[in-house]
Amino acid sequence: MEKIKAGIGMLGSGVLQALYPRRCPVCDGIVSRAGEKICLGCMDKPKLLTPPWCMRCGRKTEEGEEYCRDCREREHLFDRGRALYEYDSVAESIYRLKYGGRREYADFYGEQIVEYLGDFIRDMGPDAIVPIPLHRRRRAVRGYNQAELLARAAGDRMSIPVYSRLLVRVRDTAPQKELNREERQNNLKRAFNIPRNDVKL
């Protein structure tokens, strides 16, 4: 019976792959090998961010610098941050994840987050992961929130609960990438609300 169930599962996966083939998160080509999430030829293209990096925000720094200039000059409302890849090596991929309907990319990136940043995340001792929400109008257009997909892909693998309803975006803000530093800070003021829920903070 178990062999039959396994066979049915493999058949189902094969049918899904044929009808909805997985796309490589780098080149966006169809991944031909079953069970793989990225093309063999693209495996080395996403460049992992290597030290030295800022001890506060994770931004790349010069040799011998503990903190980047921004973190030396400004107080931030977070303890620590880390980046996984060099920006230029995944910029087009992340754009397709956010705006091109390639939600399956999140599974690959969630897996990579756990593999390379899992120890860092566990050392922080998080009680939960809270993805930044999209405004309901933007989510309706996009069909999903890429931050939530990434959070679930990583959180499920690490057995960390993901609270996607803890925050609500109450103001449809302008895209951050179009703004300068001061405008970005003002853009997010009063943009979020914490509704009544059963989650204990």
Label for each model-derived stretch:
Residues 1-201:
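Glycine-rich phosphate/pyrophosphate-handling loop used in enzymes and phosphotransfer proteins
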